[in-house]
Amino acid sequence: MLAFIGGNLIDGAGGTPLADAAVLVNGRGRIEAVGPRGAVTLPPNCPVVNVTGLTLLPGLIDCHDHLTSFGYEFIGRWGLAEPRSARVLRVAKVMEETLLSGYTAIRDCGWLDVGYKQAMEQGLITGPRLQLATSPLSPTQGTQDRSSPSGHHQPTSPDPNLPRGIADGPDAVRAMVREVVRAGADVIKFFNTGFGRATQSGSTRSYDPDEVRALVDEAHIHGKTVACHAIGGPGLRTAIEAGVDSIEHGCLLGQEPDLLKMMADQGSYLVPTFTVFTFHATQGNSHAQAEAQEFRQQHIDTVQQAMLAGVKVVAGTDAGGWEHGNNAKELELMVAAGMTPMQALVAATGWAAGCLGLDDSIGTVETGKSADLIVVDGDPLADISVLQDKNRIRLVMKDGQVYLDRLSSD
């Protein structure tokens, strides 16, 4: 047993913060009890961590990351920039840094193989709990189909452990979903619009309705959720009408109120990924810059309208194109877009766990759930950016195991 006492508790469910709280963690890595300090009985000789003056909250969750990606250059995206051994070690370092920054769960939306989960289970590396898409799907000439402006084409996956992800037609799409599931996917990710390409804009549809329905149906048959990259236009509509579980980006969704209602009614999540579009607006290629700048205000409007419509908006960065380790920047951008700090925190905890289908075990500080907890020096409800200061992340616990402890040195 281990008890945290005296801190200001933010539960991840949007409840009123609890001052002078107590959280008791049992030896199985679960939360045994939570409540006001005077209402939680501690076992005899229970170790106590006094977090008075600090904030205790659930471990943060990024619903859209790419841990194996480093930039948008073709040589890197095609796996040609370095030996695979160097990339594996680089990813392991990124995973550890991500965990130590307070992120205890990541949904990786493409190109990370199941070996990293196995390595964590074997104690070879440390990192957040992982939900993997392995290979995203797209049709020929879609986002997953890698070709350069010069016409060069990459006919195989840059990772030989992963399927290529290219499929055309309902039957081939079903077969590719099965391949991706075989490769260890927890979630099926597909691209149904482009973005930042001369040949595929954010409003260009990738798959037709029959293909999308086949994809979603096959994924759900295998018990997998479906995440769809879609910016706007027919590709966005096709995905939502087919019943995808989350829309990634959705910048132009606010233009279609009926789709917002449909998402709210069927429980689909919106992952706006403001961070990556902030990058693209200033540092992307010319096509990406133009689209990101054009979409900026519509993107903000979409999130505001989604919240009003009852759509659950969750935090995801699309990290990997530019940098790793500053995932909490997304929460600052969500607040700048009109969400309250509490809404942004729920978007990165309780609702984020729901997006991953893990809300029965993580995301909130509740009795019986996994002890994924962080302690922060500061009040993120007063200043959400405090979560970006790694020196103010005082403790990180995942499954009851402490991975970062700056409290004992105080």
Task: Tell what function each PLM region has.
Residues 221, 295-379:
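His/Asp/Glu-enriched, well-ordered alpha-helical/loop segment
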